[in-house]
Design a protein with these regions (language model features):
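Terminal, compositionally biased non-globular sequences in eukaryotic proteins
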Residues: 1-255
Length: 255
């Protein structure tokens, strides 16, 4: 091929392209994502140094008391050794990637995607972006249903930057915020937030934030200094009476 074609390829004109093809688009947390990365050569041969797949999620973080949208790389893998793609050559490389338990469910404004990038020396690197539909595990779904059966309504779901005490475990957390509809709970609680810390087929570890309703002058002072929030760390197993276990934990913070 001519030098002219190589120069054009270096600035992205007539260069190699990449397209990631997933075997399916919907996945459950802890499932393995599989597919192939298809590379098609351009008008001239090019050296492909590396192909990277990176799992991303959007999230919200606070900067100077303002909420801004950001994105977090949750996992990245390299799927090849260096090779040369010839002009107009088509090559497929299979891959598999485990979904970590911290990946958020794609509900509300939460989005998850795989970014594919080719590392081509002295050239503009082509890339591809594929969105995933992430569903909760069976046990996580059972936990959320049990909370609603206790008398709470799911108000919103946000993916946010992990608080400082959790950042050694994860960059982001997905918060399920519930508002009480039960008269008994309404007397004591403002809201309930649940974060899934670890998930497997047989167990889930959750963090429950209980926001107690202010009662009297002492209660208002507690709210003023953010002392009205209590935390419960709880592991729920598949054979547990989930609703009863959650009720016991929540009610322990109402006494």
């Amino acid at each position: 091929m001519s030098l002219f074609n190589k120069v054009l390829a270096s600035v992205g004109v007539g260069a190699a392209t990449v397209d990631t093809k997933l075997h399916k688009s919907s996945y459950t947390i802890n499932e393995m994502v599989t597919g192939v990365v298809e590379i098609v050569g351009g008008n001239t041969e090019q050296q492909i140094d590396a192909i990277y797949l990176t799992l991303y999620s959007n999230f919200i973080r606070e900067i100077d008391d303002k909420k801004v949208n950001d994105q977090a790389a949750l996992q990245s893998i390299k799927i090849n050794e260096p090779f040369t793609i010839q002009a107009n050559e088509k090559r497929e490389i299979p891959f598999s990637m485990d979904l970590p338990s911290i990946v958020p469910v794609t509900t509300g404004h939460s989005r998850v995607w795989i970014h594919t990038g080719l590392d081509i020396k002295n050239a503009i690197d082509p890339s591809d972006k594929d969105f995933l539909d992430i569903q909760p595990t069976r046990l996580a779904s059972a936990v959320l249903s049990a909370v609603q059966n206790l008398g709470f309504r799911l108000r919103k779901v946000d993916t946010e930057q992990a608080p400082s005490y959790l950042r050694n475990r994860t960059k982001i957390v997905q918060e399920f915020e519930f508002q009480t509809t039960n008269n008994t709970y309404r007397r004591y609680l403002d809201e309930l937030e649940i974060v899934f810390l670890e998930q497997s087929e047989r167990s889930v570890e959750i963090l429950i934030q209980v926001d107690r309703r202010a009662r009297g002058l002492g209660g208002f002072l507690s709210e003023a200094f953010n002392m009205d929030e209590s935390f419960i760390r709880l592991t729920i197993f598949e054979n547990d009476n989930i609703q009863a276990k959650l009720a016991d934990a929540i009610e322990s913070k109402m006494r």
